């Protein structure tokens, strides 16, 4: 290599190192914010999944002819429980889509279950069922809030990662945009 090429290479490397320092700490902080928001989403979905067995058992006692709906809810819960939900999901569009679809299936199955319970006045009068229903409604609200925070946090992170000079820093340290929820 001649002196000019060596000089350009040195300048390029120096510029990359100087610019790559730009935003490094902020990238790390925003990445941690995304991870924290994702953990909250997971916690709320897990809380909902934990309510399902109790809800199914209470409904079984009253709605003996609704086996199909009860089976759908149980299968949806099993599907959700069988999914991988670590940080890799945030960087893998296919896994993220499967996770989102499984949660949507759970939401749909629970909605059908609650609709079926309208036909059973004795069940609706059951104190344990009412308590579980209130807990489920509260959990659905928490899920909505957690998802909203996650969407906002990912949007902030993804915007930052794509801006210059942070885009260079992100590329150097292997940080990529994160997956986000689509509309249900």
Language model segments and positions:
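A helix-centric hydrophobic-segment signal that preferentially recognizes long
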Residues: 2-184
């Amino acid at each position: 290599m001649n002196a000019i090429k060596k000089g350009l290479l040195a300048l390029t490397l120096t510029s990359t190192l100087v610019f790559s320092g730009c935003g490094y700490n902020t990238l790390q902080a925003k990445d941690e914010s995304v991870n924290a928001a994702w953990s909250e989403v997971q916690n709320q979905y897990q809380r909902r999944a934990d309510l399902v067995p109790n809800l199914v058992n209470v409904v079984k006692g009253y709605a003996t002819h609704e086996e199909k709906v009860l089976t759908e809810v149980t299968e949806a819960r099993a599907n959700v429980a069988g999914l991988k939900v670590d940080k890799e999901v945030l960087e893998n569009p296919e896994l993220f889509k499967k996770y989102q679809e499984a949660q949507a299936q759970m939401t749909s199955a629970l909605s059908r279950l609650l609709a079926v319970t309208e036909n059973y006045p004795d069940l609706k009068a059951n104190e344990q069922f009412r308590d579980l229903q209130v807990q489920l409604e509260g959990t659905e609200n928490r899920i909505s809030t957690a998802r909203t925070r996650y969407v906002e946090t990912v949007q902030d992170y993804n915007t930052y990662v794509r801006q210059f000079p942070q885009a260079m820093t992100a590329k150097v340290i292997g940080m990529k945009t994160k997956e986000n929820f689509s509309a249900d």
